[in-house]
Amino acid sequence: MQFNYSKLLGRIREFGLTQKDVAAHIGIRATTLSLKLNGKARFTANEIDAICKLLHIAKEDIGDYFFTT
Protein backbone atom coordinates (compact mmCIF):
# COMPACT_ATOMS: atom_id res chain seq x y z
CA MET A 1 0.00 0.00 0.00
CA GLN A 2 1.32 3.43 -0.97
CA PHE A 3 0.61 6.39 1.31
CA ASN A 4 0.22 10.02 0.28
CA TYR A 5 2.48 12.32 2.30
CA SER A 6 1.49 15.61 0.62
CA LYS A 7 -0.15 16.91 3.81
CA LEU A 8 3.01 16.08 5.77
CA LEU A 9 5.16 17.85 3.19
CA GLY A 10 2.89 20.89 3.44
CA ARG A 11 3.26 20.89 7.22
CA ILE A 12 7.05 20.74 6.88
CA ARG A 13 6.90 23.80 4.60
CA GLU A 14 4.52 25.60 7.00
CA PHE A 15 7.20 25.33 9.67
CA GLY A 16 9.82 26.69 7.29
CA LEU A 17 11.78 23.46 7.40
CA THR A 18 13.43 21.37 4.72
CA GLN A 19 13.45 17.61 4.39
CA LYS A 20 17.10 17.79 5.42
CA ASP A 21 16.10 19.60 8.64
CA VAL A 22 13.47 16.98 9.48
CA ALA A 23 15.82 14.11 8.67
CA ALA A 24 18.51 15.54 10.95
CA HIS A 25 15.96 15.97 13.75
CA ILE A 26 14.86 12.34 13.61
CA GLY A 27 18.37 10.97 13.09
CA ILE A 28 18.24 9.72 9.50
CA ARG A 29 19.78 10.87 6.23
CA ALA A 30 17.86 13.22 3.97
CA THR A 31 17.95 10.58 1.22
CA THR A 32 16.32 8.07 3.58
CA LEU A 33 13.57 10.55 4.43
CA SER A 34 13.04 11.13 0.72
CA LEU A 35 12.64 7.38 0.19
CA LYS A 36 10.05 7.26 2.96
CA LEU A 37 8.13 10.26 1.60
CA ASN A 38 8.12 8.66 -1.86
CA GLY A 39 6.76 5.34 -0.58
CA LYS A 40 9.99 3.38 -1.11
CA ALA A 41 10.50 2.79 2.63
CA ARG A 42 8.28 2.92 5.71
CA PHE A 43 8.40 5.22 8.70
CA THR A 44 9.06 3.61 12.08
CA ALA A 45 6.85 4.40 15.06
CA ASN A 46 9.73 6.33 16.66
CA GLU A 47 10.22 8.41 13.51
CA ILE A 48 6.51 9.22 13.34
CA ASP A 49 6.54 10.23 17.00
CA ALA A 50 9.59 12.49 16.54
CA ILE A 51 8.12 14.15 13.44
CA CYS A 52 4.81 14.73 15.23
CA LYS A 53 6.60 16.41 18.12
CA LEU A 54 8.67 18.56 15.76
CA LEU A 55 5.67 19.63 13.68
CA HIS A 56 3.15 19.80 16.56
CA ILE A 57 0.91 17.14 15.03
CA ALA A 58 -1.65 15.86 17.54
CA LYS A 59 -1.92 12.11 18.09
CA GLU A 60 -5.48 12.12 16.77
CA ASP A 61 -4.23 13.65 13.51
CA ILE A 62 -1.41 11.16 12.83
CA GLY A 63 -3.56 9.21 10.37
CA ASP A 64 -4.17 12.32 8.28
CA TYR A 65 -0.43 12.88 7.85
CA PHE A 66 1.00 9.37 7.70
CA PHE A 67 -1.68 6.90 6.66
CA THR A 68 -3.67 8.59 3.88
CA THR A 69 -3.83 6.71 0.58
Predicted regions: what they are:
Residues 1-17:
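A short, Lys/Arg-rich alpha-helix, primarily the initiator
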Residues 9, 20, 49:
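Residues within the helices of the helix-turn-helix
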Residues 12, 23, 52:
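The alpha-helix within a helix-turn-helix
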Residues 17, 43-46:
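Residue-level signal for the short linker/turn that defines the boundary of a DNA-recognition helix
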Residues 17-35:
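Short alpha-helical DNA-recognition segment
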Residues 37, 47, 66:
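DNA major-groove recognition helix of helix-turn-helix
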Residues 46-61:
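DNA major-groove recognition helix of helix-turn-helix/homeodomain DNA-binding modules
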Residues 62-69:
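Short amphipathic recognition helices of helix-turn-helix/homeodomain-type DNA-binding modules
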